[in-house]
Amino acid sequence: MRAIGIILAGGNNNRMRELSDKRAIAAMPIAGSYRSIDFALSNMANSRIQKVAVLTQYNARSLNEHLSSSKWWDFGRKQGGLFVFTPTITKENGFWYQGTADAIYQNLNFLKNSHEPYVVIASGDCVYKMDYNKVLEYHIAKRADITVVCTTCPDPSEVERFGVLRMNEDCRIEEFEEKPMVSPYNTISVS
């Protein structure tokens, strides 16, 4: 695939309460030996994305330990590699990531130094299976600047947990709001 991958794994979720007191949500155990980030990593590997950056922040120690061996996903350095980035305090930047857009912004040099023409951004705390090749094919066919994978939220009271989209009849995004208190729309971004 002609894309580089970024997995956002730095957030905390107050709904997880005690479960996230000592570990990042992306490091939460799933079915025994797996962690929630393994699903995004497997999706990247199965889509033949060979260069992946994981952006960590909150309670990242156990996540970093889990990621220290990339052999499970075959992100060898010769083909690309698995990179783990934490917020870095510099003269220009004295803050932790101030959200997902800022996490991407603070790591723009990684993207600028890459040769892949496309970027796949995924969440590290979602459990799903997705072929990013199909998403990229759709993206190219639509000649889109950005493609957001979305679904309908069955419970309108739950939209406050997601990014909410309003799209036109051509499936072009006309409005996007991250975690609104209330929304008349129920199309939400996933991953």
Where are the model-predicted features located?
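Unchanged
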Residues: M1-S191
